[in-house]
């Protein structure tokens, strides 16, 4: 075990400067810690956690000022063999996961006010529907869109609940079946924007249109039509040099006994940018990510959701570091020239609140609880992006401390 001594007793559930009664965690997985450390939990540098995760090194974070037992970090993946020389990996992507038989539900033109997301996912939870991806891009006017995925086995009862929700809230819903979720995984993916760019560019070269996009620190997920799966797997495996043992189709996750929420992190160093009225065709997401990567501009959360519309366009929203926004102006101007009819829209001052827990994928209703906690504080959600172990909500900067305390 590698012991690391700091000025805090270990890893806490959240920032004690915001929540004075934050609790010390006895243990946390490296995967959970990567998600937390990437969004503001500064106890450990993400690169230290990444090396521990890759090589199965146990870390224990302790205080240099007390005898507390601290927090133990352990990796949940098969460790790589240690070799002489650098511990840095030349391959950022270490696996591809394929989840088949997914259905995409899109609720469009619903009200944009606090409590709507809570109402939707509480309703789904009451019907015992387990939701996977949840995506909300930035709102357009006074209404909003929320898109989510479920197993095709739950389509009938999900459609019934969506029908009731549109009666209560207004708007409409759309259903797409025969969809599949693809996810590339690797520590620190979002710190390397070229990785997302390579994924979307690879799918574009295969003439595969991406329907949904959601990201976290260690995973980039997208939803495509099921008939494109064999081609997508072949192209992605070739691009990222993945062997058959690194490709998992419908994997069985063994983390079901883990807590649904382990910790909460806050990142105030983000700005929100939306690309409006983009053409709905292969290669658009790739062109955005490639342009940012080529200019060394880091983006964080990036989401693309579905909207019911007669025009064949889509919106993509992302967050990026505040200091990079001005540098991105020329890049964005060039992009919109190449994508006729599109335009850039800057959002208000925002912050990102991320809830992390390895067990949240198996607990029906976790998302509803998170969104209800924000609604009870009258906090509106600007964007939502999820992975299996992280739910990130973009809120107004003025509400961020209140959101963490919620």
List each language-model region with its residue ranges.
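C-terminal catalytic "cap/lid" subdomain
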Residues: 1-386, 390-406
């Amino acid at each position: 075990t590698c012991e690391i001594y700091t000025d805090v007793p270990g890893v806490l559930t959240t920032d004690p400067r915001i929540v004075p009664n934050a609790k010390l965690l006895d243990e946390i997985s490296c995967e959970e810690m990567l998600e937390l450390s990437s969004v503001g939990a500064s106890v450990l540098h993400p690169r230290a956690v990444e090396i521990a995760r890759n090589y199965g090194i146990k870390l224990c974070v302790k205080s240099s000022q007390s005898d507390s037992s601290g927090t133990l970090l352990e990796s949940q993946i098969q460790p790589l063999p240690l070799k002489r020389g650098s511990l840095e990996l030349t391959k950022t992507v270490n696996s591809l996961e394929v989840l088949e038989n997914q259905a995409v539900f899109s609720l469009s033109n619903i009200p944009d006010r606090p409590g709507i997301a809570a109402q939707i996912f509480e309703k789904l939870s009451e019907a015992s529907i387990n939701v996977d991806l949840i995506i909300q891009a930035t709102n357009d006017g006074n209404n909003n869109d929320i898109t989510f995925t479920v197993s095709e086995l739950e389509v009938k009862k999900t459609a019934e609940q969506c029908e009731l929700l549109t009666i209560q809230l207004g708007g409409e819903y759309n259903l797409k079946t025969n969809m599949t979720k693809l996810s590339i995984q690797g520590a620190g993916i979002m710190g390397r924007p070229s990785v997302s760019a390579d994924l979307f560019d690879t799918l574009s070269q295969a003439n595969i249109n991406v329907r949904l996009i959601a990201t976290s620190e260690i995973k980039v997920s997208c939803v495509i039509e099921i008939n494109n799966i064999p081609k997508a797997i072949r192209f992605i495996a070739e691009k990222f040099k993945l062997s058959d043992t690194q490709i998992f189709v419908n994997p069985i996750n063994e983390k079901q006994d883990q807590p649904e929420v382990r910790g909460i992190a806050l990142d105030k160093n983000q700005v929100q940018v939306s690309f409006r009225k983009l053409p709905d065709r292969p290669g658009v997401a790739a062109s955005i990510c490639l342009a940012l990567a080529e200019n060394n501009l880091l983006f964080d959360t990036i989401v693309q959701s579905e909207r019911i519309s007669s025009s064949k366009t889509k919106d993509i929203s992302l967050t990026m570091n505040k200091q990079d926004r001005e540098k991105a102006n020329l890049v964005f101007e060039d992009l919109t020239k190449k994508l006729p009819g599109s335009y850039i829209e800057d959002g208000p001052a925002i912050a990102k609140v991320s809830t992390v827990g390895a067990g949240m994928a198996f607990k029906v209703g976790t998302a509803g609880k998170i969104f209800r906690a924000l609604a009870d504080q009258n906090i509106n959600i600007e964007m939502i992006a999820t992975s299996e172990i992280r739910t990130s909500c973009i809120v107004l900067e003025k509400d961020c401390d209140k959101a963490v305390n919620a």
